[in-house]
């Protein structure tokens, strides 16, 4: 998102770079939980214990879901407060807050989808997990191009467009993960 915004506005690029630090922190928690789920899940997959895999998945989903929901709610309702952690008042806070209000919900979706993609990986469907994740990244880039710069009849939306592109890509990723699990 930030890279593609660099061609339009340096403030937008910097603000989104700062705003995505929130997602980076959330991603670290998600990574830790999915790592634990994958280790335990792989062991139970080897034992053909699908009931335990299901139990581990539910625990991981609840843990990631609650953490990601908390982050999404903060981003939606307190984005200025979050941005002030990284920047003083001004355009960085304003642009970053606008981005977080939209993209914040995608953080919930990303966390949940990572749980589903992890289950695909441990049940011998790692290729499908990679295709879904990679396709979501490609879709995000294409939608960034459309929404940030205003192509194909859409208005140029700048940082808000980057957030919208991220949200749409994560919705598609989650749906694909659920339908494939």
Region annotations inferred by a language model:
Residues 2-3, 20, 39, 80-81, ...:
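Transmembrane alpha-helix boundary and packing residues in multipass membrane permease domains
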Residues 64, 119-146, 160-167:
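Alpha-helical transmembrane segments of multi-pass membrane transporters/permeases
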Residues 13-76, 110-124, 128-129:
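Small-residue-rich hydrophobic transmembrane alpha-helices
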Residues 1-14, 83-90, 146-157:
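Helix-terminus/linker motif at the lipid-water interface of multi-pass membrane proteins
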Residues 41-107, 154-181:
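Short alpha-helical transmembrane segments in multi-pass integral membrane proteins
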Residues 32, 73, 137-138, 171:
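Hydrophobic/small/kink-forming positions within alpha-helical transmembrane segments
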Residues 25, 140-144, 174-178:
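Hydrophobic transmembrane alpha-helices of multi-pass small-molecule transporters
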Residues 5-24, 91-95, 159-164:
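Interfacial/gating helices of multi-pass transporter permease domains
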């Amino acid at each position: 998102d930030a890279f593609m915004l660099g061609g339009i506005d340096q403030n937008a690029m910097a603000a989104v770079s700062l705003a995505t630090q929130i997602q980076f922190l959330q991603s670290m928690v998600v990574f830790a939980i999915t790592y634990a789920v994958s280790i335990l899940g792989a062991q139970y997959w080897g034992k053909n214990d699908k009931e335990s895999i299901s139990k581990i998945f539910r625990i991981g989903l609840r843990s990631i879901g609650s953490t990601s929901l908390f982050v999404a709610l903060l981003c939606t309702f307190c984005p200025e407060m979050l941005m002030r952690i990284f920047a003083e008042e001004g355009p960085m806070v304003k642009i970053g807050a606008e981005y977080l209000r939209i993209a914040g919900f995608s953080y919930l979706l990303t966390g949940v989808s990572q749980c589903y993609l992890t289950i695909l990986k441990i049940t011998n469907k790692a290729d499908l997990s990679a295709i879904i994740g990679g396709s979501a990244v490609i879709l995000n880039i294409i939608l960034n191009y459309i929404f940030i710069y205003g192509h194909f009849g859409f208005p140029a939306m700048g940082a808000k467009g980057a957030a919208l592109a991220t949200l749409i890509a994560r919705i598609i990723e989650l749906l694909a993960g659920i339908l494939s699990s």
